[in-house]
Every structure is written in structure tokens, then in C-alpha cells.
């Protein structure tokens, strides 16, 4: 595998100041502080189960609410993946995974196609997980999809506990991203598309 599939992104607005480092071919090492504890917990899942090395620091207007920071971290992380993958030569492109967590079961299927689309099927009954607004789960994935150019389908198959459902979702997402971004040696570094390119339309 290439040792150069790394990227650093810095994104600063009037609402947030975010820096991200990613190593696609990492070991699941993470240093994460967004100021939103539950989001940190989910980002650790992406690193741990995707085997991506992640360093994420975010300062945002969380004194208002978590929306801007949550969304902007999704945007910046999507940009970091895009930059690290480059032309996406040799990758599997597609990924899928079923992740259980106790009674919850979530399926994620995705395509690193350059065509941003989100189909979101989580049914979360609790309005909050700790202090985290559960509506922000969808907002995070919308932001990530639009900035990374992936097609992402999230389907909840079973589940009652909102924490279990969301954590299963992030675990399934991380394993799907791992599968999609891994190198297919049979491709010999070619782009996995009949049109010869994968870019955000």
C-alpha cells in the first residue's frame, strides 16, 4: 500500500476553527477533541474500526449549540478523505458492512464515486444521547457526503436504544470506508471507473 495517502486540512470560519490529519493506511490511532464528547466517541469509532489514523481538533461556538461544529467537522473530514485519496487510483471503491451492537443492527453501503448522495434510515426515538442532539447524526453524514463525494446508504435493521443504533451506524460506516478505500492489487493502480475518473460532479 502507498504510504502517501495522508492529508491535512485546516478550515476556519466565523463559527469554527478545525484542523484534521488523516492517514488512510494507518493503525487506528486517534487524537480527537471537538468539544462535543459524543461526537468524539463516534469519531474514535471511525478511526479504530476503519484503521485510519486521525487527529482532529475543533473549536466552535458550542456555547450556542453543537450544530456548527458537528457539521463543519463532517465537512472537514470529508475533505481530508478526498485529499488523501487523490485520484482514487486502485481503490476498491465500494464498501459495505453490517454492524451489530446488542439489539441494534445497522447496514451501511457506500460508493466512493464522486456522486454525493445520502439515504438515511436511522429511526432514533431519543431526542438526545447525553447532551448530543440526535438530529445531528444525519447532519454530520450530509456534510461528509457532500464534501467527500460519496454515495452513502444507511439502513437500520433492528434497534431500540438510540446510543446503540448510532454507534452501530458509525462502526458499520468505518468498516465500509475501510473496505472502499483499501487498494485492490488486481487493479494495478488504475481508477475503478469505466469513464476513467472519479471526481465530485
From Swiss-Prot:
Keywords: Amino-acid biosynthesis, Cytoplasm, Histidine biosynthesis, Lyase. Its EC number is 4.2.1.19. It is an enzyme of class 4 (lyase). It is found in: Cytoplasm. One of its GO terms (biological process) is L-histidine biosynthetic process. The keyword Zinc does not apply. Pathway: Amino-acid biosynthesis; L-histidine biosynthesis; L-histidine from 5-phospho-alpha-D-ribose 1-diphosphate: step 6/9. It catalyses: D-erythro-1-(imidazol-4-yl)glycerol 3-phosphate = 3-(imidazol-4-yl)-2-oxopropyl phosphate + H2O. GO terms for molecular function: imidazoleglycerol-phosphate dehydratase activity. InterPro entries: IGPD_sf (IPR038494), ImidazoleglycerolP_deHydtase (IPR000807), ImidazoleglycerP_deHydtase_CS (IPR020565), Ribosomal_Su5_D2-typ_SF (IPR020568). Pfam families: IGPD (PF00475). Gene3D superfamilies: Imidazole glycerol phosphate dehydratase, domain 1 (3.30.230.40). Signal peptide: none annotated. One of its GO terms (cellular component) is cytoplasm. The keyword Cytoplasm applies. Belongs to the imidazoleglycerol-phosphate dehydratase family. NCBIfam families: PRK00951.1-3, PRK00951.1-5, PRK00951.2-1, PRK00951.2-4. This is Imidazoleglycerol-phosphate dehydratase.
Amino acid at each position: 500500500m502507498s504510504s502517501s495517502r495522508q492529508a491535512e486540512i485546516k478550515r476556519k470560519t466565523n463559527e469554527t476553527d478545525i484542523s484534521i490529519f488523516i492517514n488512510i493506511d494507518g493503525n487506528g490511532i486517534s487524537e480527537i477533541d471537538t468539544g462535543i464528547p459524543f461526537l468524539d466517541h463516534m469519531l474514535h469509532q471511525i478511526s479504530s474500526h476503519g484503521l485510519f489514523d486521525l487527529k482532529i481538533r475543533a473549536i466552535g461556538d458550542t456555547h450556542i449549540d453543537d450544530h456548527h461544529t458537528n457539521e463543519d467537522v463532517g465537512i472537514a473530514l470529508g475533505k481530508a478523505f478526498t485529499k488523501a485519496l487523490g485520484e482514487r487510483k486502485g481503490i476498491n471503491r465500494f464498501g459495505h458492512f453490517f454492524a451489530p451492537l446488542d439489539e441494534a443492527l445497522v447496514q451501511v453501503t457506500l460508493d466512493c464515486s464522486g456522486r454525493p448522495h445520502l439515504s438515511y434510515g436511522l429511526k432514533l426515538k431519543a431526542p438526545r444521547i447525553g447532551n448530543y442532539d440526535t438530529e445531528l447524526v444525519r447532519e454530520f453524514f450530509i456534510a461528509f457526503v457532500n464534501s467527500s463525494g460519496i454515495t452513502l446508504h444507511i439502513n437500520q435493521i433492528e434497534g431500540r436504544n438510540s446510543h446503540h443504533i448510532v454507534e452501530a451506524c458509525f462502526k458499520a460506516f468505518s468498516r465500509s470506508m475501510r473496505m472502499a478505500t483499501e487498494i485492490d492489487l488486481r487493479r494495478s493502480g488504475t481508477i475503478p471507473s469505466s469513464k476513467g475518473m472519479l471526481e465530485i460532479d
